[in-house]
């Protein structure tokens, strides 16, 4: 569960940094 928390925080940081880029592009 710790890993999930870290991934979620990284995902949130990504969203804050690149608000104009759809987050889906990072995982496809």
Curated annotation (Swiss-Prot):
It is a peripheral membrane protein. Keywords: Cell inner membrane, Cell membrane, Membrane, Stress response. Induction: Constitutively expressed. Repressed in minimal glycerol medium, at low oxygen, induced by H(2)O(2), the thiol reductant diamide, at 45 degrees Celsius and at pH 5.5 (at protein level). Transcription is repressed by CRP. GO terms for molecular function: enzyme activator activity. It is found in: Cell inner membrane. InterPro entries: AzuC (IPR049862). One of its GO terms (cellular component) is plasma membrane. NCBIfam families: stress_AzuC (NF033642). This is Uncharacterized protein AzuC. The lineage of its organism: Bacteria, Pseudomonadati, Pseudomonadota, Gammaproteobacteria, Enterobacterales.
